[in-house]
Amino acid sequence: MTKSAELFAKAQEKIPGGVNSPVRAFAGVGGSPIFIERADGPLIFDADGKAYIDYVGSWGPMILGHNHAAIREAVISAAQRGLSFGAPTETEINMAELVSELVPSMEQVRMVSSGTEATMSAIRLARGYTGRDKIMKFEGCYHGHADSLLVKAGSGALTLGQPSSPGVPADFAKYTLTATFNNLDSVRELFAANKGEISCIIVEPVAGNMNCIPPVEGFHEGLREICDAEGALLIFDEVMTGFRVAENCAQGYYNIKPDLTCLGKVIGGGMPVGAFGGRKDIMQYIAPTGPVYQAGTLSGNPVAMAAGFACLKVLTEEGNEKRLATTTKQLALGFKELANKHGLPMVVNYVGGMFGFFFTDQETITTYEDVTKCDIERFKRFFNLMLAHGVYLAPSAFEAGFTSLAHGPKEIEATLEAADRCFAKIAAESK
């Protein structure tokens, strides 16, 4: 038995399922999860000392790579001045100014401690601002574990086969309407059936919690037009895509201006950070300037702000986002070429520093329904073979993968060499 397996058995005695976030339990791929002891650059090292090329990146935040010197030094420096004050600091201002500069639609920014807090707060704000109770989300999209958002959700909820969670009262869930991602007709139908009742649409601009699904041409433009016509707010949940798709986030990449934006992951540089922001007239509805209440003991934590500020400063240096996108493209197209070589039909999607691959003979993957038709069992086999070859992919067919600036030609070459061997084995087993 490996040390990771021993730790997992021990963890299950005191931690529900042995993990503090469900997808980490490897329920979507089988077997026992690896327990991580340390990480550096593009590599993670498990409790048994084995190294893996990491394409999970702590589920997105580690865009510079693990243990980056600039972030590490910023954290140490901030920690030496105090861990938490529960009072305003200049670092919060610096961080808000930088975020607003990079994402112009975020005229004002409120810091929180997680992506879930960001989306939960943005939806409360949208309801308070519009005076409407209903919200619209998309099937397979995940926006954190707030009650109103765990309806036909993606991510770990989808991995475990429970996209709509028990514990969410039906009377509460009725205020959440679910449309089909990449299908504007489904959006129009819901607005027509709920005239004047919908406060907002919340959407992942690139769906990353049913693997990786970019928008089809005209989808986001259509959402913007519909929201304007119906008096609803458009919320971009950029917790995953923020600063990973492009320097000015997915909204800059697709040239769409949402009313509100939610951020997380990358803006913390590995620390627990979230944020939401948008038009000043809307943000002024948040307490203490407005009636919509939102608060948090650790919001704007000085150590977390220092980490996030350092991360964004390095990430936005000239050429870095382009290099990240190039690396991702090489990896994704390499997977597809090798899968085809071994007679294994595959679709790959990629944008910026995120990617997804699907074992399927479908031409494209654009909706949740398309994803559910893919060969999940083949994905499980590929995941476990790659893990044995020292490559750590997302342990779920419904999660996007991530590259970092620390991934270079050496890591991509090693990953594709491993994939070649794994595809060959799967092809041989399929005969």
Swiss-Prot record:
Main location: cytoplasm
Protein name: Glutamate-1-semialdehyde 2,1-aminomutase
Cofactor(s), by name: pyridoxal 5'-phosphate
Subunit comment: Homodimer.
Similarity remark: Belongs to the class-III pyridoxal-phosphate-dependent aminotransferase family. HemL subfamily.
N6-(pyridoxal phosphate)lysine PTM positions: K265
Gene3D superfamilies assigned: Aspartate Aminotransferase, domain 1 (3.90.1150.10), Type I PLP-dependent aspartate aminotransferase-like (Major domain) (3.40.640.10)
E.C. no: 5.4.3.8
Database matches in InterPro entries: 4pyrrol_synth_GluAld_NH2Trfase, Aminotrans_3, Aminotrans_3_PPA_site, PyrdxlP-dep_Trfase, PyrdxlP-dep_Trfase_major, PyrdxlP-dep_Trfase_small
Catalytic activity field: (S)-4-amino-5-oxopentanoate = 5-aminolevulinate
BP GO annotations: protoporphyrinogen IX biosynthetic process
Keyword Nucleotide-binding: no
Swiss-Prot/TrEMBL keywords: Cytoplasm, Isomerase, Porphyrin biosynthesis, Pyridoxal phosphate
Pathway per the UniProt entry: Porphyrin-containing compound metabolism; protoporphyrin-IX biosynthesis; 5-aminolevulinate from L-glutamyl-tRNA(Glu): step 2/2
